[in-house]
From Swiss-Prot:
Catalyzes the direct conversion of aminodeoxyfutalosine (AFL) into dehypoxanthine futalosine (DHFL) and adenine via the hydrolysis of the N-glycosidic bond; this reaction seems to represent an essential step in the menaquinone biosynthesis pathway in Campylobacter species. Also catalyzes the hydrolysis of 5'-methylthioadenosine (MTA) to adenine and 5'-methylthioribose. Can also probably use S-adenosylhomocysteine (SAH) as substrate, leading to adenine and S-ribosylhomocysteine. Belongs to the PNP/UDP phosphorylase family. It comes from Campylobacter jejuni subsp. jejuni serotype O:2 (strain ATCC 700819 / NCTC 11168). InterPro entries: MTA_SAH_Nsdase (IPR010049), Nucleoside_phosphorylase_d (IPR000845), Nucleoside_phosphorylase_sf (IPR035994). Keywords: Amino-acid biosynthesis, Hydrolase, Menaquinone biosynthesis, Methionine biosynthesis. SUPFAM superfamilies: Purine and uridine phosphorylases (SSF53167). One of its GO terms (molecular function) is 6-amino-6-deoxyfutalosine hydrolase activity. This is Aminodeoxyfutalosine nucleosidase. GO terms for biological process: L-methionine salvage from methylthioadenosine; L-methionine salvage from S-adenosylmethionine; menaquinone biosynthetic process; nucleoside catabolic process. The active site is at E13 (proton acceptor), D197 (proton donor). The lineage of its organism: Bacteria, Pseudomonadati, Campylobacterota, Epsilonproteobacteria, Campylobacterales.
Amino acid sequence: MMKIAILGAMSEEITPLLETLKDYTKIEHANNTYYFAKYKNHELVLAYSKIGKVNSTLSASVMIEKFGAQALLFTGVAGAFNPELEIGDLLYATKLAQYDLDITAFGHPLGFVPGNEIFIKTDEKLNNLALEVAKELNIKLRAGIIATGDEFICDEAKKAKIREIFNADACEMEGASVALVCDALKVPCFILRAMSDKAGEKAEFDFDEFVINSAKISANFVLKMCEKL
């Protein structure tokens, strides 16, 4: 038995899991709600952090440091940068970067600060497990680079710039910060995103239309991973 954290940013990303689990308890802590359940001989702690890097950093830290999570699976949605990605497609991050971390005025590359690398890698064993699950379910799962920042990207020029600098396949607002916490605390991390939009013009309208279904796709996949851990 292990304790597994499942984290999302929005209620839409965690509610499908709670509806499946049904029997859970909850604890209020640090201005958020944490849900606890047993599933396939594992203890789960679930939460949605609220949107953004700071919120997700706080929740990931609480799940590991206070509640003892031994692995963290992030489930949610993202905007597609890679033209081969369609809405609803699943992407797991091999590595992530913060595209809005900017001290380029001092001659450093975008996404870099002293003491940190630009890219944070995720856990190879969890990534391989995800590929096994995808094969069993006959689901297409793509590996790629995710760019994280505190902005919803709905602009073609910004999208092109971030993709060019980081070779990013998708963008979102929490993954890199969660991966950084897990890396620092030596906890295996897996970041899964279902595409909800294409991060360009009118992306906000696609997001509103597809976020719920895309979030369910990601959530169901993560729960299947728990069965294999």
